[in-house]
């Protein structure tokens, strides 16, 4: 078969079966449920359950961002340097880390009785660093989508639904924690402490531990099942090269820089994400009611991703990403205005309107969650065409250099903005005597500003670099066909 016919066949043939597709998405969904459980609740656990002072919370966020980043530098070189065996390159890694990752997730919401002060701080930092390391290895489950099929349209379809599964899975812990909170109360917590001799510090702490345990069990089963059935079908060289050269190739790629700058700017929205649990507590009187904020946003996200998936048939990804940034700024500003009126008047109709606007805010996540993975997959092919190597782990790491800087700034500054002496927001921490303290109007409004307008500004700025991004349409297809030709020649040499 000629190279031309082989390339045409690869662009037309369907490789991924329905069973493989469904089980893979289930694995991704529950893997992201595990990461979402920690990402969405750990800050609230530190502040409301362990009662860390703001200085320790900021230091914790700084250390648990920087230390895993340094370790990840070596981990991604190991992953990209692995030879593709019979089981593939990424599948075995995802299967190996599923169980230890689940265990560390549970430990992220449990502190041994008697620990306090410096010893407690060292413990939670150690667990968080381990969690970060396992997440880097576990992210191999997402890399599998890039190599499941050489068919460009089928690859984009897999990436689209993988992103949808990730987004919905990331929101699932909110519902899980809520349901657990409805079942377990203060009496249950005291009973468990008495029977087991443990020291779970609050009902909220019990919610997190039980929720983490549920996520871990289901996560292990689905990740192992999904990774057992999927196949990696992309052919690429197994030649060993200096991994540092790969980083240089990525940095030299002009298309890569668009994504690097965009993700750098977008990660400042971590300040907004940090505020989510606390605005729920401030506005609704109970942090467990966070679902009233998160659920409309989550539904909007799922709908938004389906809408983006449909619009990709008529518009290119670049246009949709830029438009999404503009929409995000407008929707968040409108939500702030409605929220402000609600806080100052207490009108129940405005409360309903505000919830609707939370749904509208969620729509913009459709683009921000779905399209970056496609951009990265396209850029990886331009690098593969030049070098013959794939850098599925190294490229996200290079992107993370920028997000490390902006994310570290965001996670370090956010607690200082939120509470403590001299904070801008003035959030009052709960205590044993006052578990749900009343927050002032100024606190609620300022929290809302950082939760909405701050987020909209950063999403708008994240779209600006894509005004200069040209790897779309015909250019994207030409690169893909050239890569398929290169892979076919490589396969013939290896045969």
What is the role of each PLM region?
Residues 3-495:
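Membrane-embedded alpha-helical bundles of multi-pass transporters/translocases
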């Amino acid at each position: 078969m000629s190279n031309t016919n082989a390339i045409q066949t690869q662009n037309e043939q369907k490789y991924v079966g329905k069973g493989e597709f469904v089980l893979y998405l289930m694995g991704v969904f529950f893997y992201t449920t595990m990461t979402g459980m920690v990402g969405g609740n750990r800050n609230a656990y530190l502040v409301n359950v362990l009662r860390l002072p703001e200085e320790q919370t900021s230091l914790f966020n700084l250390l648990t961002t920087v230390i895993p980043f340094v370790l990840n530098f070596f981990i991604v070189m190991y992953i990209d340097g692995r030879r593709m065996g019979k089981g593939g390159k990424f599948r075995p890694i995802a299967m190996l880390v599923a169980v230890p990752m689940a265990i560390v997730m549970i430990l992220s919401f449990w502190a041994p009785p008697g620990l306090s002060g410096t010893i407690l701080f060292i413990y939670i930092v150690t667990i968080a660093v381990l969690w970060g390391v396992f997440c880097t290895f576990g992210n191999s489950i997402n890399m599998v989508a890039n190599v499941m099929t050489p068919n460009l349209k089928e690859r984009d379809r897999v990436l689209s639904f993988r992103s949808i599964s990730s987004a919905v899975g990331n929101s699932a812990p909110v519902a899980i924690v809520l349901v657990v909170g409805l079942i377990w109360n203060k009496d249950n917590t005291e009973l468990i402490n008495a029977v087991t001799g443990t020291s779970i510090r609050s009902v909220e702490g019990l919610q997190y531990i039980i929720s983490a345990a549920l996520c871990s069990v289901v996560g292990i089963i689905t990740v192992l099942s999904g990774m057992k059935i999927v196949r990696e079908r992309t052919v690429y060289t197994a030649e060993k090269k200096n991994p540092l050269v790969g980083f240089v190739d990525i940095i030299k790629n002009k298309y890569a820089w668009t994504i690097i700058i965009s993700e750098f700017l977008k990660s400042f929205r971590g300040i907004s994400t940090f505020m989510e649990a606390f605005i729920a507590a401030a506005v609704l009187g109970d942090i467990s009611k966070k679902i009233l904020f998160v659920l409309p946003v989550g539904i909007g996200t799922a709908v938004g991703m389906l809408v983006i998936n449909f619009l990709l048939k008529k518009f290119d990804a670049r246009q949709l990403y830029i438009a999404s940034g503009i929409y995000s700024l407008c929707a968040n500003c409108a939500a702030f205005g409605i929220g402000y009126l609600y806080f100052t008047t207490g009108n129940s109709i405005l409360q309903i309107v505000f919830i609707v606007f939370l749904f509208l805010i969620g729509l913009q996540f459709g683009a921000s969650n779905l399209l970056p993975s496609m951009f990265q997959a396209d850029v990886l092919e331009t690098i593969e065409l030049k070098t013959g190597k794939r850098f599925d782990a190294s490229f996200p790491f290079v992107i993370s250099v920028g997000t490390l800087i902006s994310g570290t700034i965001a996670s370090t500054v956010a607690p200082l903005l939120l509470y403590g002496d001299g904070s801008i927001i003035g959030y009052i921490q709960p205590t044993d005597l006052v578990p749900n303290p009343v927050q002032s109007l100024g606190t609620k409004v300022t929290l809302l500003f950082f939760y909405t307008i701050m987020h909209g500004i950063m999403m708008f700025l994240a779209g600006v670099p894509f005004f200069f991004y040209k790897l779309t349409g015909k250019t994207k297809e030409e690169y893909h066909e050239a890569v398929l030709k290169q892979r076919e020649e490589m396969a013939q040499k290896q045969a």
